Structures are given as structure tokens and as C-alpha cells.
Amino acid sequence: MSKLEPILEFVFTAHALKEMARRDITEQEVQEVLANPEQMEIVQDGRAVYQNKYVVSKTSKTYILRVFVDIDIKPPHVVTVYRTSKIEKYWR
């Protein structure tokens, strides 16, 4: 599998910032996913989800951080972000 194209310049929507605060997800975590994505999937015209797996050392539990991006806008807009433990459902 070839390396996915990173997104280095982007903006956060107000909704994304609100959800990140509510879900305790930092801008740095989002930047890491977009700079070095492990997976990317087009979910609808102009929108993609970038995601990475990571392990929380405190609990040893594996999660996916999913970042939804409107990619047809320049610069791309981060629309929403969440983490999930549903690896089987989302990891391709």
C-alpha cells in the first residue's frame, strides 16, 4: 500500500472545535492523523475520513481517531472528529 497524501494545511470548523472540546481531543492529535494518516476513505462527494489507530497506555485499550475533512475546499476543512473503540467496524 502506498503512503497516503498528508494534509498539512487545514482549518477547523466551529463544529469540529466544539466537538473536540467535548470529546477531549486536541488539535495536535488531529494534526498527527492528517500529517501521517494510516487510512483514508471517501465517505461522500468531497468528504473523506482520515484515521489512525492508537493504544491508550493507561488502559491498554485500542482506539481509532477519525477525522472527517471536506477535501474539495482549499484549504481543507476539518468538519468533525471522534474516537471509537469499534475497530472491526471502521478499520479496513
Predicted regions and their residues:
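Ribonuclease/tRNase effector modules and their secretory precursors
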Residues: 1-92
